[in-house]
Amino acid sequence: MDAQQGHTTTILMLPWVGYGHLLPFLELAKSLSRRKLFHIYFCSTSVSLDAIKPKLPPSISSDDSIQLVELRLPSSPELPPHLHTTNGLPSHLMPALHQAFVMAAQHFQVILQTLAPHLLIYDILQPWAPQVASSLNIPAINFSTTGASMLSRTLHPTHYPSSKFPISEFVLHNHWRAMYTTADGALTEEGHKIEETLANCLHTSCGVVLVNSFRELETKYIDYLSVLLNKKVVPVGPLVYEPNQEGEDEGYSSIKNWLDKKEPSSTVFVSFGTEYFPSKEEMEEIAYGLELSEVNFIWVLRFPQGDSTSTIEDALPKGFLERAGERAMVVKGWAPQAKILKHWSTGGLVSHCGWNSMMEGMMFGVPIIAVPMHLDQPFNAGLVEEAGVGVEAKRDSDGKIQREEVAKSIKEVVIEKTREDVRKKAREMDTKHGPTYFSRSKVSSFGRLYKINRPTTLTVGRFWSKQIKMKRE
């Protein structure tokens, strides 16, 4: 396929190299490419591209409407190419990966010069990307893979340092609030670092910012973020990977057989993402919490890359697996989360509340037991409770996970009749925003509205203004 022929508009996408960023970008790319008026260049590291190749539908692979483009990061003895991803990356190497990504700006400029796309869609962690695009007269818009709640809460103190957040209906618990803000509401040093990164990326976006969210969840935050940025903020979510090919996910057969033997909505899926590795103490509290809950569970345990010695038995309390018996299935490394959440016997998701996992839980109508760990996750956990689709397992005054709270939260969500409201609200999310929602999303009308081959900042803003108007109709 010649991307430059006819009226095809070329878009280059540059996500951060974490799964929680790659997959929403890929879903956006797939949706746009199906319009047949767009050719997508999907730019990332070699190891990241290898990870997403199996998730490309055969129809897209055959017509080459999404073309994978390698971004070469500088390698070093501590950060060889196979570690150019956050998936399983040891936490002490994360700063080196961020620095290597920044150092790839020169190679990215060569890519832009060679491909000359009509538009760049970039991620929240690359303030240098729109600068490179601007130097080549290529308009760039930001796509945030997290929600408007966290973005607006983080940016508010910078714009209005002496006033409270105006639309808050939930308050961060003491442990998390102390991490990001001082007693008078000002940002801490950690909070300032996050705010500076976000502001640099969002304010340089051409007239519009895309967010992987939807109005029924975050209307007031989306509108307030638009005020803070003085830009249109367009929700294009929920963008969640939807597996639809039989045999696509290896290892699911044994998991499905196990799930098939359980009662409807009787099982929780436990996962803390691909980037966070709970400490020994945290693992024990979570394990004992699961044991005390007396609920069936599938738990995915992940270990950092290069850790070939850790075993499931070593990571868990002595005798835990024997005591759990048939209630438990523990999987090392990876499990097909979307397929498990879709199964009729799954009744809850015990999650770190990464935005992507949270969207998946909502998309498949599964209530969430939130156990946030860091970054945007405390904000997301608060939003889960505010939306009524889950509960947060409260930590103690020192910020430590409590087994009793984990067990209590699981029981509330899965068993207790008094929290049928949570289960009902989660099911409503599935009905409104399940697997068919994004095909109905107004983003799918991109091709009908986008008329200009090489848009300027102004035309990009006008186009997305139409998207917002259609969203509200």
From Swiss-Prot:
Family affiliation: Belongs to the UDP-glycosyltransferase family.
Organism lineage string: Eukaryota, Viridiplantae, Streptophyta, Embryophyta, Tracheophyta
Keywords carried by this UniProt record: Transferase
The name this protein goes by in its record: Mogroside IIIx synthase
Pfam families assigned: UDPGT (PF00201)
Function: UDP-glycosyltransferase involved in the biosynthesis of cucurbitacin and mogroside tetracyclic triterpene natural products (e.g. siamenoside I and mogrosides IV, V and VI). Cucurbitacins have cytotoxic properties and exhibit deterrent taste as a defense barrier against herbivores. Mogrosides are nonsugar highly oxygenated compounds used as high-intensity zero-calorie sweeteners; they also possess pharmacological properties such as regulating immunity, lowering blood sugar and lipid levels, protecting the liver, and acting as antioxidants and antitumor agents.
Binding-site residues for UDP-alpha-D-glucose, renumbered to this chain: 274, 337, 355-357, 360, 376-377
Example GO biological process: carbohydrate derivative biosynthetic process
Enzyme Commission no: 2.4.1.-
Note: Mogrosides, the major active constituents of S.grosvenorii fruits, are a mixture of cucurbitane-type triterpenoid glycosides that have been proven to be powerful and zero-caloric sweeteners and can hence be used as a sucrose substitute for diabetic and obese patients.
EC primary class: transferase
Listed pathway(s): Secondary metabolite biosynthesis; terpenoid biosynthesis
This protein's record includes keyword Transferase: yes
InterPro entries, per the entry: UDP_glucos_trans, UDP_glycos_trans_CS
GO molecular function per UniProt: UDP-glycosyltransferase activity
Gene coding for it: UGT94-289-2
Swiss-Prot/TrEMBL catalytic activity: mogroside IIE + UDP-alpha-D-glucose = mogroside IIIX + UDP + H(+); mogroside III + UDP-alpha-D-glucose = siamenoside I + UDP + H(+)
Tissue expression summary: Highly expressed in mature fruits.
